[in-house]
């Protein structure tokens, strides 16, 4: 599990080391980690050191010093390195070490801005060391002009071979929310120090960061049981976490003990949503899927998935461990009634799409809402909070958490990064899904995966403990696991080209086979 922290948490963790005079030690560890990633990027791209050039963009703070020290290490390996100082003053000791190694420090001004921007664009590698975790807001003044010029010039190149690595975080990315303040130089990789920052796991920050590399500089924030350990502000599940929470079939199991998921989905207008959701649930592994809905939809489902037990009954008459309601269920009074019954049943329930409007003011955390940004906007508006969809997309963790605390539900907010938030404050962010999954029906398959996990774990009180999480994070962790499985299945499907979500179930099974191996 990847734990992420706010900028304030990381800075607070550094204070004892700085007070003890170990600031330079932390800086050298950070710089070395940055150098290793930058040098490996050059090597992996086929660039030899003595034929490569790098430009280090240097701000006034410690972030700029880290970048300069990394640049000095590149010089040792034979890379030609130039530093562009965007501030009047930069870290004097780092600048001196860099210069002694043969590096040039050029101070940016209006006269040389075009030439220095062109130099950066022509280089093999740029290290962005302008703003760090202590910065608030985006780039200003001449630094902003430089990045804008680089972005414009790099975009005009016929083939973008320029590599960019960000030092701690890309300049212009909010360290906590991930919101972007333009201009931002998007990175191929970000090397962050001490621990991951929440802004690098969500929203535009994750997109701008590229591949995330965390360098351990000895703060001990993520060491279990240590005095220096800190409660994460955000988490990201990894494959081994899914293996820990997934319920494997046991000797003596039968279809009822393996988990029964009731599904009230689909309508005359959108029958396919029910087919996709039930298929994904079956592929995830459980004892039985019971479908409640229109006979015409049931006929289609049974033609594709004959093992699904279909009826036109009500929730109260159906034996299930959990419910999935809402996918494709629009303008259907019977499906709306079933959604209300499932939400009121006291059983865990996944509430998607058309059923979101049936959620009462307050529910339990075992009610998992799965809106996209537009649906979350509507849900918040009905509770007196007026927010634009664009604002939700810019700061998804903030608004998913707000919705969870407002309703008492667990909230899974779909998007480029999938955010799950518990009403007790725990937040997860998953980013495995490829852009190919941004297609109709993708959310239906995600809800089916989640429904199956919820049904198999409905009577399992040990999920949180197995993951080392607070009990209140149980359903948020299960939702994050569903997002991870969905994303990895999408990645596997995308290996052969555009993704058709109807073909996703076999990939769900193969992903789980690898995870559980």
What is each residue range found by the language model?
Residues 90, 142, 183, 441, ...:
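Short acidic-hydrophobic sequence patches enriched in Asp/Glu that either
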Residues 92-94, 117, 176, 300-301, ...:
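Short Asp/Glu-rich motifs
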Residues 119-124, 184, 317-319, 343:
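A short, aliphatic-rich alpha-helical micro-motif
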Residues 90, 111-113, 169-175, 198, ...:
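Short acidic loop-to-helix transition motifs that present clustered carboxylates
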Residues 36-132, 138-167:
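Nucleotide and nucleotide-moiety/phosphate-recognizing core
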Residues 124-125, 130-232:
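Internal gly/pro-rich beta-alpha loop/helix module
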Residues 1-86, 198-353, 357-368, 373, ...:
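Small-residue (G/A/S/T)-rich helix-start motifs and N-terminal tracts that mark the onset
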